[in-house]
A protein has these predicted regions:
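Active-site beta->alpha N-cap acidic-glycine motif
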Residues: 1-79, 132, 209
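Acidic-and-aromatic substrate-binding clefts and catalytic sites of carbohydrate-active enzymes
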Residues: 32-37, 55-67, 88-98, 120-129, ...
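Active-site-adjacent pocket scaffolds in enzyme catalytic domains
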Residues: 110-114, 120-216
Length: 216
């Protein structure tokens, strides 16, 4: 495998990952708490062993619920970025709801001394207003979209798309896009749950094969 530059990012959703479904039974919430109790310490240990920096996208709800886990991320020197307040898909919100959610999460981040440069949308989706709001609040980058694989690009605001007419491109946003890909998301491969059903029982060796092939 040739030398590659890799951006390591972690979505520390904890309990909030279930709010958008919604599915907040004790069993599901316990699975979310696993991230704070077990997942984050193990990830931080691994990053320290290999001297790797990373970015953690953290909902405000997680910041307020698990302050010690979030503090350990900051103490280790990693970037903390915006990931909404309660992990609700922005495409399901009104403009006022989305703005309130964005501001509430910013308040949570500022309480721990973070003025975020980056944003990642919950559920890997956006409303037509999301990128414009990110500009208004002076974000430098987004990491939610998939119009490229490894190269940063500037996303567009105000595209017009319909079944009857070809794409009419909007203007370039002032912020940069650091694209994501579902095949690199461990949730897709490993998370098993009944409701909504997700058969996340992949063999780690198979997932590693996929990731190495993508990097090659």
């Amino acid at each position: 495998m040739p030398n590659s530059t890799i951006a390591l990012t972690f979505d520390f959703d904890a309990l909030s990952v279930w709010f958008g479904y919604p599915n907040t039974t004790p069993a599901m919430l316990a699975r979310g708490e696993y991230g704070a109790r077990v997942g984050v310490p193990r990830v931080l240990d691994l990053l320290q062993i290999h001297h790797l920096p990373a970015t953690f996208f953290i909902p405000g709800h997680t910041i307020d619920s698990f302050p010690h886990a979030v503090a350990s991320i900051l103490e280790a020197g990693h970037e903390v970025a915006h990931h909404s307040y309660a992990h609700i898909d922005p495409s399901t919100q009104t403009l006022d709801e989305e703005r309130h959610d964005l501001e509430r999460a910013l308040d949570a981040l500022r309480r721990i001394g973070v003025q975020p440069l980056g944003y990642r949308s919950p559920s890997a989706d956006m409303s037509p207003a999301t990128l414009g709001l990110l500009e208004t609040y002076d974000f430098r980058y987004d990491s939610s979209l998939m119009a490229d694989d490894f190269r940063p690009y500037r996303p567009r605001i105000g595209d017009r798309v319909s079944q009857q007419e070809p794409l009419v491109p909007g203007r370039l946003a002032r912020l940069w896009e650091l694209p994501i890909a579902f095949e690199f998301d461990d949730w897709v491969h490993f998370q098993f749950n009944f409701n909504p059903y997700r058969n996340g029982t992949s063999a780690p060796s198979k997932v590693l094969e996929i990731w190495i092939a993508e990097l090659d």
